[in-house]
Swiss-Prot record:
Protein name listed in UniProt: 2-dehydro-3-deoxyphosphooctonate aldolase
Pathway: Carbohydrate biosynthesis; 3-deoxy-D-manno-octulosonate biosynthesis; 3-deoxy-D-manno-octulosonate from D-ribulose 5-phosphate: step 2/3; Bacterial outer membrane biogenesis; lipopolysaccharide biosynthesis
Main location: cytoplasm
InterPro entries: Aldolase_TIM, DAHP1/KDSA, KDO8P_synthase
Keyword list, A-Z: Cytoplasm, Lipopolysaccharide biosynthesis, Transferase
HAMAP family from the UniProt entry: KDO8P_synth
Any single Gene Ontology cellular-component annotation: cytoplasm
Family: Belongs to the KdsA family.
EC number: 2.5.1.55
GO function term, MF aspect, one: 3-deoxy-8-phosphooctulonate synthase activity
C-alpha cells in the first residue's frame, strides 16, 4: 500500500522509508546545553546514517505545577534555535501552544508540533495550518487512534496536508500510560497513510498522584522503543539528557545522553529488518 511522504527539506518521512529520528531535549534549559546535546545527536546520527531533526521546547506551557520550570520563552527560544541552525545546519521541531505563536515559530523552525493536550483546539489547528509548515500532531492520551483522522481533516481543510502523527500512549486508569501497538496501523489508515512516529519518552511517564513533576520508567525505554520499531514506523521521538536526574523537565523518562549511540544501533537494526520484509496482507 502506497505510503504518504512528508518532506522536511531534504529529509523524507514515510512509514516505509528508513526511520527519521526526532530527538533532543525536553525543554531548552540553556543555550550551551542545547548546543552540546544537538552536537552529540548529530555526531551519532551521522555516524549511523539516520536522518535527524532536533527537538526542544521553548515553553512548557502545560506543566502541572505553577512552580515548575517552563523554558526561556518565545523570543529567547527562537534565538537559540537560529544559532543551532546556523552552527549545525540542523532541522528543528518545536511545539506551539497559542495561535499567535504559530507563524513566528514557523518562520524559524522546520516542523511545528501540536501538543497532545491541545490537539482538538480548532483555532490553534487553523493557525498552524496557515503557516504551510510541516506539522507533527501528538495524539492526546484521551483520544483513540481512530479519532486522529478528524484532526488530520482539520489541517486539510486549512490547506495543509503535510501532517505527521505521533503516539505517546493512552491513559490507563489514573496517572499511568500504556501504548497500544495496534493503534499505529489504525492511525495510518485513518490519515491516508500519513507518516506515524512514536514518542517513546513521554509514553514512559508515570505520575505520582500527589506529586507535581511527572515520574518515569527510564529503565524500560529500550524495550518499549524496540516494540514500537517492530511495527514499522516513519520515525522515533526520543529525548535525552546528560544528567537526567537533574533535568528541569521529564528527567525520569529521558534517555541518558551517553547511551544514545547503542540505543540507536538497536533501533536501526530493527527498522532495517522490518522494512526488508515483503508486505503481508492477513486481512483475507
Amino acid at each position: 500500500m502506497k505510503q504518504k511522504v512528508v518532506s522536511i527539506g531534504d529529509i523524507n518521512v514515510a512509514n516505509d522509508l528508513p526511520f527519521v529520528l526526532f530527538g533532543g531535549m525536553n525543554v531548552l534549559e540553556s543555550r550551551d546545553l542545547a548546543m552540546r546535546i544537538c552536537e552529540h545527536y548529530l555526531t551519532v546520527t551521522q555516524k549511523l546514517g539516520i536522518p535527524y531533526v532536533f527537538k526542544a521546547s521553548f515553553d512548557k506551557a502545560n506543566r502541572s505545577s505553577i512552580h515548575s520550570y517552563r523554558g526561556p520563552g518565545l523570543e529567547e527560544g527562537m534565538k537559540i534555535f537560529q544559532e543551532l541552525k546556523q552552527t549545525f545546519g540542523v532541522k528543528i521541531i518545536t511545539d506551539v501552544h497559542e495561535p499567535s505563536q504559530a507563524q513566528p515559530v514557523a518562520d524559524v523552525v522546520d516542523v511545528i508540533q501540536l501538543p497532545a493536550f491541545l490537539a482538538r483546539q480548532t483555532d490553534l489547528v487553523e493557525a498552524m495550518a496557515k503557516t504551510g509548515a510541516v506539522i507533527n500532531v501528538k495524539k492526546p492520551q484521551f483520544v483513540s487512534p481512530g479519532q486522529m483522522g478528524n484532526i488530520v481533516d482539520k489541517f486539510k481543510e486549512g490547506g495543509n496536508e503535510k501532517v505527521i502523527l505521533c503516539d505517546r500512549g493512552a491513559n490507563f486508569g489514573y496517572d499511568n500510560l500504556v501504548v497500544d501497538m495496534l493503534g499505529f496501523s489504525i492511525m495510518k489508515k485513518v490519515s491516508g497513510n500519513s507518516p506515524v512516529i512514536f514518542d517513546v519518552t513521554h509514553a514512559l511517564q508515570c505520575r505520582d498522584p500527589f506529586g507535581a513533576p511527572s515520574g518515569g520508567r527510564r529503565a524500560q525505554v529500550a524495550e518499549l522503543a524496540r516494540a514500537g520499531m517492530a511495527v514499522g514506523l516513519a520515525g522515533l521521538f526520543i529525548e535525552a539528557h546528560p544528567d537526567p536526574e537533574h533535568a528541569k523537565c521529564d528527567g525520569p523518562s529521558a534517555l541518558p545522553l551517553a547511551k544514545l549511540e547503542p540505543f540507536l544501533k538497536q533501533m536501526k537494526a530493527i527498522d532495517d529488518l522490518v522494512k526488508g520484509f515483503e508486505e503481508l496482507d492477513t486481512s483475507k
